[in-house]
Design a protein with these regions (language model features):
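Conserved P-loop NTPase motor "coupling/switch" region that bridges the ATPase
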Residues: 1-9, 17
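Conserved Helicase C-terminal RecA-like lobe
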Residues: 11-34, 48-168
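Cytochrome P450 catalytic domain signature, combining two hallmark sequence patches
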Residues: 39-46
Length: 169
């Protein structure tokens, strides 16, 4: 297995350009977020009263994760949600702008459901993409990377953070 660390390939990478774009939640999305936040507060308060900090410690990460997912798109958590997401809409407009200017894009996420949602949206607007998540074999990962690098029609590569570097040479 070959593994390349950032320090080994940093000279080959283009200069990093970072742009922060702040996006307000849409009205429906905000309602869902606030309702979920109130549930989180109640659950933590109840757990503190029942079992103290030791009980709360195991609850916090899943609760915060759910809030993060709602900020991306409530559809990730609630499959029947249909009102859309300002964040996903803005993301898609950036992807369209970048790919229309002849560039390719790597997209990383921690959430497979977000990856699948974005893949579906890209497909619906005619932007070809490849995806790597835990379900893709090492051989297929390398094939997708090679195809992405050599096929100008494929503009976006969607990658799960946990599986992005695994099985790639």
């Amino acid at each position: 297995i070959l593994r390349r660390k950032k320090k080994d390939v940093i000279k080959e990478l283009p200069e990093k350009i970072e742009t922060n774009i702040f996006i307000e939640l849409g009205d429906e999305q905000k309602k869902i977020y606030v309702a979920e936040l109130n549930k989180v507060k109640e659950a933590i308060e109840e757990a503190l009263n029942d079992g103290g900090m030791s009980k709360v410690r195991f609850m916090i990460l899943p609760l915060l994760t759910k809030l993060r997912q709602i900020c991306i798109d409530p559809k990730i958590v609630y499959s029947d949600y249909t009102s859309g997401s300002n964040k996903i809409d803005r993301f898609l407009s950036v992807i369209e702008e970048v790919t229309n200017n002849g560039h390719k894009v790597l997209v990383f996420t921690s959430f497979r459901t977000a990856l699948n949602l974005v893949k579906d949206k890209l497909d619906s607007i005619g932007i070809k993409s490849y995806q790597i998540d835990g379900s893709v074999s090492s051989k297929e990962r390398q094939t997708r990377v090679d195809n992405f690098n050599n096929n100008d029609d494929v503009k976006v590569f969607l990658i799960m953070l946990k599986s992005g570097g695994t099985g790639l040479n």
